[in-house]
Amino acid sequence: GMNSSWQWYKNGISIPVLRNKIHPYYGIYFPTRFDHLVLFDNWLKRYQGSKKTAIDVGFGSGVLSLQMIQHGFQKVYATDINPNAIVGLSEFMGTTKLSRKIELDFGHLFGKWNKQTELIVFNPPWLPEAHDTEGIDNAVYYNKDLFPDFFAAAKKRLLPEGKLVLLFSNLAQITNVSKEH
């Protein structure tokens, strides 16, 4: 695992919907399938709303934030509960224009971002938690409070004409881990 992680960080990973490779830190979720990213990219191409601000909840390697900037959003506020995600994306952005367009916060769900926004994006964990999780497992397994907490907080932060995009896998249903999903 450590060698593979080092190679991904050092050499980068090509993501079809991005112009540049990403260089994820160890323990950071990064996509290995791209259907949902292509779907989101197509949605962003057709999006007609304001592009002043957006919030990316649980940004991981930053792909969704980068997509939103690539499609004209002026500012993205992004949160993650993994400190390596903050370090990794901060290092990737460096002192480029991106670092002024994407603001990061180490925090649960919306972290310190209380402002209302035009767009909220969330690619949540996709399997119900069967045990206590930590580290990268938090990107895969969710607890029973995640979605009620997310929707309650999102309601307060979404502008009246705003949009909420939830990119959610049906893996739990396909693998019969959960019938409710």
Label the predicted regions.
Residues G1-I13:
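N-terminal auxiliary segments of SAM/dcSAM-dependent transferases
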Residues N3, K21, P31-F34, N42:
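Terminal helices and disordered tails flanking the catalytic cores of nucleotide-processing hydrolases
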Residues N20-Y26:
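Short, aliphatic-rich beta-strand segments
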Residues R33-W113, L119-F122, P128-E129:
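Conserved SAM/SAH cofactor-binding pocket of Class I
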Residues P83-A85, P124-D149:
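Mobile active-site "lid"/loop adjacent to the S-adenosyl-L-methionine
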Residues S90-E91, H131-G135, V177-K179:
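Short amphipathic alpha-helical segments
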